[in-house]
Regions:
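Histidine/acidic residue-rich metal-binding segments in metalloenzymes
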Residues: 1-48, 60-76
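His/Asp/Glu-enriched, well-ordered alpha-helical/loop segment
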Residues: 18-21, 25, 67-152, 160, ...
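Short beta->alpha connector loops
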Residues: 31-35, 55, 132
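Short, acidic/turn-prone active-site loops that include or flank metal/cofactor-
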Residues: 53-57, 82-84
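Short aromatic-centered micro-motifs
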Residues: 177
Length: 186
């Protein structure tokens, strides 16, 4: 960030917007060190932000200010980043870390609801790829599904399935994946 400011007199989001990069659909990763102006630019340009909590934690990069990005109108998604900065590409783990890091950073146990977190990982992820036909359970949407075994000890008790998905589910709980109605794994 500092190098971009020194070279171009602007933060990376402002500089890239001025170059026209955000005139096409864009997803920006991490976005840990945004200014208010950066958030305004990203929101105005409709840039999605992929939060990568495990990568940010491993590299000591900081915690993305989800609250400020949401307030600015930025649509958030979830990412795992690459193998150099996250050795475990486990979306369940990253979803869990995103929830915990935001709650710890905000000192607020309800800063992101389980339902909101699931939307970040599913619906918003699909939208960031231009896929309006998936990422949600709705008549007419593609049947892209992941089914989990909820009879494991760590998934009990089931008071709220959304909470269990965020705070208890593991990749090993997946018993079925389906893409556009075709079962790929069972």
């Amino acid at each position: 960030v500092q190098e971009c400011i020194e070279r171009h007199g602007k933060t990376p989001p402002v500089y890239l917007a001025d170059l026209g990069l955000f005139d096409v659909p864009t997803t920006a990763d991490h976005c840990v060190w945004l200014t208010d102006e950066d958030r305004s630019v990203l929101a105005e340009k409709g840039v999605f932000v992929a939060c990568c909590p495990a990568s940010n934690a491993k590299l000591g990069s900081g915690i993305a200010d989800i609250k400020a990005m949401k307030a600015a109108g930025i649509t958030l998604t979830l990412g795992t980043d690459g193998v150099a900065s996250n050795n475990n590409h486990n979306m369940f783990q990253d979803l869990y870390l995103l929830a915990l890091m935001q709650r710890a950073g905000d000192a607020n146990p309800v800063s992101l609801s389980a339902e909101e977190l699931i939307g970040i990982a599913t619906r918003n992820g699909a939208l960031s790829q231009g896929r309006v036909d998936c990422g949600r359970m709705q008549v007419g949407a593609r049947a892209d599904l992941t089914m989990l075994d909820i009879d494991t000890p760590w998934m009990q008790p089931v008071h709220t399935m959304a909470e269990n998905l965020i705070y208890s589910a593991q990749g090993s709980d997946v018993v079925l994946t389906m893409v556009d109605g075709t079962i790929l794994y069972e």
